[in-house]
Amino acid sequence: MVRYRVRSLSERSHEVYRQQLHGQEQGHHGQEEQGLSPEHVEVYERTHGQSHYRRRHCSRRRLHRIHRRQHRSCRRRKRRSCRHRRRHRRGCRTRKRTCRRH
């Protein structure tokens, strides 16, 4: 999961104002029914809000690349032929790879 930046006070006040307008349209089904005091509203938004955290969908290639870096050193990298890449055929790249760690 990726955490977003902390919102500024102006963004929070605008969001609270928008929630109040939305709550008036629905009636009293907002924060009063849940029994939240104004001090606990911010904590509730942090823990139950969906705006702070976003699920990051990892592709299989990205996961493989991340875990390969953890377990293998750059010297033991496995060589593969250009025919192995069947999805993206961009031609053979014979450029020598250099180690990025050093």
From Swiss-Prot:
InterPro entries: PRM2. Proteolytic processing into mature chains is required for histone eviction during spermatogenesis. Transition proteins (TNP1 and TNP2) are required for processing. The gene is PRM2. Residues 1-102 are annotated as: Disordered. It comes from Homo sapiens (Human). Keywords: Chromosome, Developmental protein, Differentiation, DNA condensation, DNA-binding, Nucleosome core, Nucleus, Phosphoprotein, Spermatogenesis. GO terms for cellular component: male germ cell nucleus; nucleoplasm; nucleosome; nucleus. The lineage of its organism: Eukaryota, Metazoa, Chordata, Craniata, Vertebrata. Protamines substitute for histones in the chromatin of sperm during the haploid phase of spermatogenesis. They compact sperm DNA into a highly condensed, stable and inactive complex. Its main location: nucleus. Residues 49-102 have a biased composition (Basic residues). GO terms for biological process: chromosome condensation; chromosome organization; nucleus organization; spermatid development; spermatogenesis. Signal peptide: none annotated. Belongs to the protamine P2 family. The modification Phosphoserine is found at residues 8, 10, 37. Residues 8-17, 39-48 have a biased composition (Basic and acidic residues). Interacts with TDRP. It is found in: Nucleus; Chromosome. This is Protamine-2. Testis. One of its GO terms (molecular function) is zinc ion binding.
